[in-house]
């Protein structure tokens, strides 16, 4: 086999941070001069997360080629330079759909279609297709869910078969939780032992055990895990809870020397690892002595911390070149204290979303920011809120609205895109990377320093072309358009320090080492506003 495979599974509890671990391993392996590809296998039966409620699943991350994916792919992007595509993700829904389609097309020659071998073979096909497309030295495969979940069994069986076929080219990392009982002042290894026993009963003996814990594990505890889980002591690693930032994870794993172990098992020669640049970024990010900037996030899914994951991370990245500390203030659009909360902030960000709930609150937030000259950044639905607000209160069209929110509005300044009126919801939006032509002498051009960019999209609605001339004649600047059809991509509000809306999702391109320029300029404007107000 021309590539090496690392399979990452999780046990004991969910939300262990497998995605962050996989992303961190990718960064460390890249620093060793290896080309890395990544694949996330999700056991849920949805074809993709595109129609899933953000309260259940968190945000939907979109790749350049227009695939709606799990938010873990966002971690992969932010930590490493891996190329992500439709080959970087698969769900049980996709796997079963392919198997059933093949059966309907007669490709199984009348055989009884079963989980083994037909479903497992399809999973193996996904792994091989990812490797063939990206041609990596190392392919990291994260298996979603927790060992013991019935949904994961076909994926684990496929992993077992794949490892049997390529024993010298595969490694299994099992990530577990090792609880610390404060009352007894004891670290308990039994849950890890049981999780590994469960995994071994399926036919997979882990090569590495990565123990997530609240406190550092002693050599004695590692020896105990080694003994009862049948792995060498030097294959037991500790991922202690991070103190300040998720971006400390590569530094933690580097201190554990886990990559040296993996490379030696694969027959690679480890190189000296220099993470000085990453350490400097993390140190700056965690520096609390910079001027504090408070950004109000006006969104409807605030109860789920992962619903706006990429937005949160993009703001965090931008705080480094903007040279400020950051506090993100969640503000409900339905709150009666909306304007009072915004008055305490240095900037307002209105993120993407769907549906009528909270819509009027987002428009109210946009109006308050425009009236009070507060920096404001609207993304996707947020941009549409800026346009509707401007139409209502600057153009004196009081009933102006989006057709998504009011199908009977007399002034539909936001309308459905041509060809989007479909009953099928999954995977039918305008998805993926599209070009955007930027007008010189604009806030957007000042940020990008170029007149043509590629940004990722996820939407059905657009600024109504029938109202573009009226909006522009009354001052609204359309400074970014898609050359393919002149779709409005970026708007700027006139006579304002910094008020900008984008139809795309810039948060999907930001990295710690390469913050997105629009977020940097937004935070810089918020910092200037804060300093002018004399805020501490």
UniProtKB/Swiss-Prot annotation:
Its EC number is 6.3.4.2. PROSITE patterns: GATASE_TYPE_1. The keyword Ligase applies. ATP binds at residues 15-20, 72. Pathway: Pyrimidine metabolism; CTP biosynthesis via de novo pathway; CTP from UDP: step 2/2. The keyword Calcium does not apply. Keywords: ATP-binding, Glutamine amidotransferase, Ligase, Magnesium, Metal-binding, Nucleotide-binding, Pyrimidine biosynthesis. Allosterically activated by GTP, when glutamine is the substrate; GTP has no effect on the reaction when ammonia is the substrate. The allosteric effector GTP functions by stabilizing the protein conformation that binds the tetrahedral intermediate(s) formed during glutamine hydrolysis. Inhibited by the product CTP, via allosteric rather than competitive inhibition. Disulfide bonds: none annotated. Mg(2+) binds at residues 72, 142. One of its GO terms (molecular function) is ATP binding. UTP binds at residues 14, 188-193, 224. Residues 294-532 form the Glutamine amidotransferase type-1 domain. Homotetramer. CTPSs have evolved a hybrid strategy for distinguishing between UTP and CTP. The overlapping regions of the product feedback inhibitory and substrate sites recognize a common feature in both compounds, the triphosphate moiety. To differentiate isosteric substrate and product pyrimidine rings, an additional pocket far from the expected kinase/ligase catalytic site, specifically recognizes the cytosine and ribose portions of the product inhibitor. This is CTP synthase. The gene is pyrG.
């Amino acid at each position: 086999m021309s590539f090496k495979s690392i399979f990452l599974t999780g046990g004991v509890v969910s939300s262990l941070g497998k995605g962050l671990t996989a992303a961190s391993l990718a960064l460390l392996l890249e620093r060793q001069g290896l080309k890395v590809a990544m694949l996330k296998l999700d056991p849920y039966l949805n074809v993709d997360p595109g129609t899933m409620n953000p309260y259940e699943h968190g945000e939907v991350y979109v790749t350049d080629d227009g695939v709606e994916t799990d938010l873990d792919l966002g971690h992969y992007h932010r930590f490493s330079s891996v190329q992500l595509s439709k080959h970087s993700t698969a769900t049980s829904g996709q796997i079963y759909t392919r198997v059933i389609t093949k059966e309907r097309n007669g490709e199984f020659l009348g055989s009884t279609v079963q989980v083994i071998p037909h479903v497992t073979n399809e999973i193996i096909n996904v792994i091989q297709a990812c490797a063939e497309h990206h041609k990596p030295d190392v392919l990291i495969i994260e298996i979603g869910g927790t060992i013991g979940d019935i949904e994961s069994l076909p994926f684990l069986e496929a992993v077992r078969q794949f490892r049997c076929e390529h024993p010298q080219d595969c490694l299994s990392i099992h990530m577990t939780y090792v609880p610390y009982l404060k009352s007894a002042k004891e670290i308990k290894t039994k849950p890890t032992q049981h999780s590994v026993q469960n995994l071994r009963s399926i036919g997979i003996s882990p090569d590495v055990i990565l123990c997530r814990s609240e406190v550092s594990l002693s050599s004695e505890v590692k020896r105990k895990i080694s003994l009862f889980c049948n792995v060498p002591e030097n294959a037991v690693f500790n991922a202690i809870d991070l103190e300040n930032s998720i971006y400390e994870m590569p530094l933690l794993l580097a201190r554990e020397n886990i990559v040296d172990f993996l490379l030696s098992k694969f027959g690679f020669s480890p190189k000296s690892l220099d993470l000085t640049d990453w350490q400097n970024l993390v140190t700056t990010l965690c520096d609390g002595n910079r001027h504090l900037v408070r950004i109000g996030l006006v969104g409807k899914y605030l109860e789920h911390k992962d619903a706006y994951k990429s937005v949160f991370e993009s703001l965090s990245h931008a705080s480094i070149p903007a040279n400020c500390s950051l506090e993100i203030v969640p503000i409900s659009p339905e709150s009666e204290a909306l304007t009072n909360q915004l008055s305490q902030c240095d900037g307002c960000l209105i993120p993407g979303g769907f549906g009528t709930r909270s819509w009027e609150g987002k428009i109210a937030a946009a109006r308050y920011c425009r009236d009070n000259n507060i920096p404001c950044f609207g993304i996707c639905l947020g941009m549409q809120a800026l346009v509707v607000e401007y139409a209502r209160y600057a153009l004196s069209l009081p009933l102006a609205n989006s057709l998504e929110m009011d199908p009977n509005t007399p002034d539909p300044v936001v309308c459905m895109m041509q060809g989007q009126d479909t009953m099928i919801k999954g995977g039918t939006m305008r998805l993926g990377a599209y070009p955007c032509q930027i007008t010189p002498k604009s806030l957007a051009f000042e940020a990008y320093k170029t007149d043509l960019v590629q940004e990722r999209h996820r939407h059905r609605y657009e600024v109504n072309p029938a109202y573009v001339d009226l909006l522009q004649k009354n001052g609204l600047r359309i400074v970014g358009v898609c050359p393919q059809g002149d779709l409005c991509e970026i708007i700027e509000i006139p006579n304002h320090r910094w008020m900008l809306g984008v139809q795309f999702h810039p948060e999907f391109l930001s990295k710690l080492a390469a913050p997105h320029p629009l977020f940097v300029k937004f935070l810089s404007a918020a910092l200037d506003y804060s300093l002018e107000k004399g805020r501490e």
